[in-house]
Amino acid sequence: MTKKAESKELPPFEYPEGYQLFAGVDEVGRGPLVGAVVTAAVILDPNNPIEGLTDSKKLTDKKRELLFPEIQEKALAWSLGRCEAHEIDELNILQATMVAMQRAIAGLNITPDFALIDGNKVPELPMAGLAVVKGDLRVQEISAASIIAKVTRDREMEELDKAYPQYGFAKHKGYPTKAHFEAIEEHGVISEHRRSFKPVKRVLGIE
């Protein structure tokens, strides 16, 4: 079965009954060797719909940049959460992602009744929550969160690229590409690199 066929067969999402305010939560940046893992939480306004919401990875940069301010303007509430590279090294990437999600939800200026989390794990939260596999494709609130998180982190990588142009962060966004491997082999690591990740440990000689 192809990936495309799988996506067509995703079951429609049924929102849990008895709740009014749903926050969608997603993360960007679990895989990169550098920078924070960034999360977003979004509560959409059912009376102010946003066209074109889907998984941020399926959108062009231009479309994400167009949707980003529209989500910020039309959502009832949105918030960012993050865990920096040093926190990822202390906690591990899974736990750091959970903490970043908790921070995003805590930052909302409206408290949701229910949190819908992309993936298969729910962090400890003060409200009910549900993990939704492929949630960024199935749940609009999660789609919106994925766009907010993706645009935010990509912009951070573009800023980091200005400070360290030799690494090519604007292009690969910190992910473990051949160009990134070659750059850290040649130039070493910077403070934003995740020292617990194997390719970085190898360059540091601590593997």
From Swiss-Prot:
Endonuclease that specifically degrades the RNA of RNA-DNA hybrids. A divalent metal cation binds at residues 26-27, 118. The keyword Cell inner membrane does not apply. One of its GO terms (cellular component) is ribonuclease H2 complex. The lineage of its organism: Bacteria, Pseudomonadati, Pseudomonadota, Gammaproteobacteria, Vibrionales. The keyword Hydrolase applies. The gene is rnhB. Transmembrane segments: none annotated. Keywords: Cytoplasm, Endonuclease, Hydrolase, Manganese, Metal-binding, Nuclease. It is found in: Cytoplasm. Pfam families: RNase_HII. Its main location: cytoplasm. This is Ribonuclease HII.
